[in-house]
């Protein structure tokens, strides 16, 4: 039976696009659904600030009048300009285990990209680094996180069959929370705090942290992450959007800022309780009862034993000087007090030695790996 590809053009079809992932992974113990309303906003060209510099279309694959696959075709013009590339991205790709389906989806993205002057196709990638990146190639028996996507083992097999090659890998670590701050960690943090006259800043009010350092946090990200794979700087509209979206839901005990002698932000560490199990229980919906599971995971005492390390950023001139040790010397006692057993690092670029070096004094387990693929079109 022939595969039919249809561009999403109505709100009903967009909802089907989002829900196909839920259907394909229904009852899968490792997949964590995205929040449905967040996905609606992400794909909305009027609401997502990334569309200032991105263009995209979404496609559904049908077989015998049933949806059997989906994919987003994306061009991040800012990233292409930054890295001097002509690449079309495929993102949010899902398909049944049928080569005709995956080939039809990828062929559609290739043709869409060619029409717009692109020379290569890469992915899975989203609009920006704030979207999930990479296809899982190791760790299929591990629970996914809110910041990543899960996929079946047959996905990368389809990619390789279609001639895709490795473009970049991310690794993920399970980091066990120590009973005490490692001695060397403590010595390093004390030394660099005195040497550079650094201060640890903590907040209890989302409004105050947004007022004082909301803008600076995301400007620091632009500085720290600019050399990383595919990164494109956040625009002012994106920064405003993220400050409004993310800061109010954080447990600020798990947010540590480090400033210099002039109170300028030089490092930030942001973590939060894992929402993986809560999102599974809510099935990606806030209503009618999904909000309860999420609030319980975030703020109630009987929370998950796992936390997610969402963001660690250090100003370039302070990297490799022990600032990460200072961040975690403040955060580890918080994790212990709140009863966390281990942390998920979330994806780190395989070749980013600076990031992986910060786990040197912890017991860790590299338990997942994901890949971005690329090929000429």
Name each model feature, range by range:
Residues 1-30:
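Generic start-of-chain signal for non-secretory N-termini
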Residues 21-63, 71-81, 204, 208-209, ...:
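A conserved beta-strand-loop-helix scaffold within acyl/acetyltransferase catalytic domains
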Residues 74-78, 93-95, 126-128, 178, ...:
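An acidic- and aromatic-residue-enriched active-site/binding cleft used to recognize and process polar
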Residues 82-163, 282-361:
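Acyl-donor binding region in acyl/amide transferases
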